[in-house]
Amino acid sequence: MKGYSIKEFPERSARARIREIDISLKDAVNVAHFLKGMDLDSAKNVLDNVIEKKVPVPYFRYMDSVSHRKGIGPGRYPVKAARAFKKLLEDVSANAEFKGLSDSLEIVHIAVSKGRMIKKYTPKAYGRAGAFFKDLVNLEVVVRESGEE
């Protein structure tokens, strides 16, 4: 399907994506890795706990100087990325309901990719402005009914 990194979609599946959202790419990659394979309801509950800073997201990549968390190793609480993924999961849940799928859904594909870069400015001394570039992020998810192969 055009615009998705997955080539063929499973039978009885739903999909959603968010394009060019202003969140950290590194946090998004780790949150996506954490959510892959979960069922949809438990993923939403976990993201609620991450937003409330009760459950850390284990980091498997980009973990230079990331603090150790009790029981999981290196991890953080990426609140902004968790909010974006929660919105994405709510979108895919609505799409699945529209398609008439059951409530027991599992995440079979979740991907993060770089979007375009935007130029931003930060104030400097003596009235100057320094330019820097910010990467935007694309998110996509595909869910299917549990028990389907």
From Swiss-Prot:
<dbReference type="GO" id="GO:0003735">
    <property type="term" value="F:structural constituent of ribosome"/>
</dbReference>
<dbReference type="GO" id="GO:0022625">
    <property type="term" value="C:cytosolic large ribosomal subunit"/>
</dbReference>
<dbReference type="GO" id="GO:0019843">
    <property type="term" value="F:rRNA binding"/>
</dbReference>
<keyword id="KW-0687">Ribonucleoprotein</keyword>
<comment type="function">
    <text>The globular domain of the protein is located near the polypeptide exit tunnel on the outside of the subunit, while an extended beta-hairpin is found that lines the wall of the exit tunnel in the center of the 70S ribosome.</text>
</comment>
<dbReference type="GO" id="GO:0002181">
    <property type="term" value="P:cytoplasmic translation"/>
</dbReference>
<dbReference type="Pfam" id="PF00237">
    <property type="entry name" value="Ribosomal_L22"/>
</dbReference>
<comment type="subunit">
    <text>Part of the 50S ribosomal subunit.</text>
</comment>
<dbReference type="InterPro" id="IPR005721">
    <property type="entry name" value="Ribosomal_uL22_euk/arc"/>
</dbReference>
<protein>
    <recommendedName>
        <fullName>Large ribosomal subunit protein uL22</fullName>
    </recommendedName>
</protein>
<keyword id="KW-0689">Ribosomal protein</keyword>
<dbReference type="InterPro" id="IPR036394">
    <property type="entry name" value="Ribosomal_uL22_sf"/>
</dbReference>
<comment type="similarity">
    <text>Belongs to the universal ribosomal protein uL22 family.</text>
</comment>
<keyword id="KW-0694">RNA-binding</keyword>
<dbReference type="InterPro" id="IPR001063">
    <property type="entry name" value="Ribosomal_uL22"/>
</dbReference>
<comment type="function">
    <text>This protein binds specifically to 23S rRNA. It makes multiple contacts with different domains of the 23S rRNA in the assembled 50S subunit and ribosome.</text>
</comment>
<keyword id="KW-0699">rRNA-binding</keyword>
